[in-house]
Amino acid sequence: MNQITVMGMVLSAMPIGEYDKRIVLLTRERGKIPVFAKGVRRPGSALSGGVMPFSFGEFTIYEGRTSYTMMSASISNYFAELRGDVEGAYYGFYFMEIADYYCREANDEREMLKLLYQSLRAILKERIPNRLIRRIYELKAVCINGEAPQVFGCVVCGDSVRDGQFSAKKGGKVCVECDMDVFDGMRLEVSTWHTLQYIVSSSVEKLYTFTVSEPVLKELEQIVERYMDVYVEKQFKSLEILESIQQ
């Protein structure tokens, strides 16, 4: 067996047998990996604090032929404040579900890990609305996965000057000369186009540095929701709960 140290975040944890847990780690070095934490449910286990969802830090694990086993954890951020905020916690669970959906073992998932970490921090800072954080996260996650919408020019002809509308099914902006067969198009405020362009093109570190007006936020919500419906083939349980508690 090979002992390695990885940096990452616990996406989920589930009991295995009487005393163990199986956790899913999103790591900088190995992508998304399943890790067994043996004896972690015994009273006084030194690993108990390192296997809770949201826990971020360094994990020392053994790499076996078919599985990983956790040996120790040094947690730098538990995001403990989220546990006292029901709505904030479910935003976090939803973000982790999306990360789990997209990420794979042995892939370079550094950008997704960074996005997840910065998004949880943004929820805690409360500088911008959670509704906006959600749409930024969703759209950027899709972009990191290689399915970014075209928002700088027409998806058909490439023109970047003419007015146009956003079509989720077409994959982005369609100009007025090419929109004859667009049936799901939305005409957007100029500020909404600028917001989409900023999210698509900016680094993760600069994502949560702005806010928008309510009309722009509503358009952004509609656009991202439609885009997710087309490109994400999964129903997220945490999102269903989040939307139910917001009603």
PLM region spans:
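Non-catalytic alpha-helical scaffolds and adjoining flexible linkers that form interface surfaces
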Residues: 1-247
